[in-house]
Amino acid sequence: MKYRDLRDFLSLLEQRGELKRISQPIDPYLEMTEIADRTLRAGGPALLFENPKGYSMPVLCNLFGTAKRVAMGMGQEDVSALRDVGKLLAFLKEPDPPKGFRDLFDKLPKFKQVLNMPTKRLNSAPCQEQVWQGEDVDLSRIPVMHCWPEDAAPLVSWGLTITRGPHKERQNLGIYRQQVLGKNKLIMRWLSHRGGALDYQEWCEAHPGERFPVAVALGADPATILAAVTPVPDTLSEYAFAGLLRGHKTEVVKCLSNDLEVPASAEIVLEGYIEQGDMAPEGPYGDHTGYYNEIDNFPVFTVTHITQRQDAIYHSTYTGRPPDEPAVMGVALNEVFVPILQKQFPEIVDFYLPPEGCSYRLAVVTIKKQYAGHAKRVMMGVWSFLRQFMYTKFVIVCDDDINARDWNDVIWAITTRMDPSRDTVLIENTPIDYLDFASPVSGLGSKMGLDATNKWPAETPREWGRPIKMDEDVRARIDALWDELAIFSDKDAKR
């Protein structure tokens, strides 16, 4: 699936019945959240609010409200194809040298994809068709959603934040929520381990007292947005990976006020800086956990320029108790994670982040167990291999006869294959999401691993149970006889 920008992607969605235009006046204050939430929970389309109350700019919501649309945004026709995206990332993360001519020929498609990686720099771009600067900068022109009744202020939710550290050639792209503080000020809520925060910290150390340049793109194309939330190798830029997903190079343009490069087709771009030491209390906000989070201090982003396309569209979302868009994206990106993990741990059969676990707080892993203690090694690997799992609080490891995506199977394994004392791993004083109010200290808490695998002789002195299973010949005979028995009125009833 090929598209060039967000508008092109919306046209594709509309052709497939995946976009609903809403002409009625809808208020960005709470009403859009309620409509988007009901639509997402019903598996409905992306929503384009054409007449937000009090604004002339349309609002796009629920863009990634189904796993199918996430896959479409990554250039694939269905979610299962995202495994191929994961295989490509695994290859780029740790490329294997060709073993011979035939192997080289087999790898040529991957090398061809890499050709789409470099960005294409433009001298002028659609995102700079209209420009406001200085006193003309006014964020109140943008219909920023106020999502929940007790939220502190309107919140920019899909801000693709572009930064560059003082010692880095490539830029970092990250999605960080931003509280509207005034007509030209936002609060940049980035956690200390995230790329933007690390760039800022390095800048402060290298350039004490100097302003840190920042740009925020709103309404970038889906490939660029999704690249920013995908486990891209540290040596690969998100723009480059977006080019791979899209099938052609990412087009960028230099900001008007600094040297950062932004997506050329973005609907809106905010340019500005962070003054060192300029902090403000952020929150509370309803977040993806289903609760309002605590108030904490974060840097203030001062906007000096707003550039945008003609007839710009504001891309927004809400976060709340799962399912929400982050949870749906987690389900889709789950398929990307599996090949990356399997590259490092070939014994992994499946890996699942249940959306009801707030996208990343609980993981279920199934493995081909090969030795005593194997499950514990896998737990440690999950927590340490990808930074995306740094905040995963619970890891459940099961054998490959268990379906990681079926709670009936997983709960059966936990309750029949675990001894709570022997098979529970507790690790204290580990990094935890700052939004996790259950941890005893903000940003620091514990992790739990559950070994729900069959135990080997070295792990237990007792005879281990054998699962009950019907004789296959008997099953075949009853299969042939089943319809004739007519036990259920519906012949297609589950057996």
UniProtKB/Swiss-Prot annotation:
Its EC number is 4.1.1.98. Coiled coil: none annotated. Prenylated FMN binds at I175, Y176, R177, R189, W190, L191, R194, G195. GO terms for cellular component: cytosol; plasma membrane. Keywords: Cell membrane, Decarboxylase, Flavoprotein, FMN, Lyase, Manganese, Membrane, Metal-binding, Ubiquinone biosynthesis. One of its GO terms (biological process) is ubiquinone biosynthetic process. Mn(2+) binds at N172, E238. One of its GO terms (molecular function) is metal ion binding. It catalyses: a 4-hydroxy-3-(all-trans-polyprenyl)benzoate + H(+) = a 2-(all-trans-polyprenyl)phenol + CO2. Belongs to the UbiD family. NCBIfam families: PRK10922.1 (NF008175), UbiD family decarboxylase (TIGR00148). Homohexamer. This is 3-octaprenyl-4-hydroxybenzoate carboxy-lyase. The gene is ubiD.
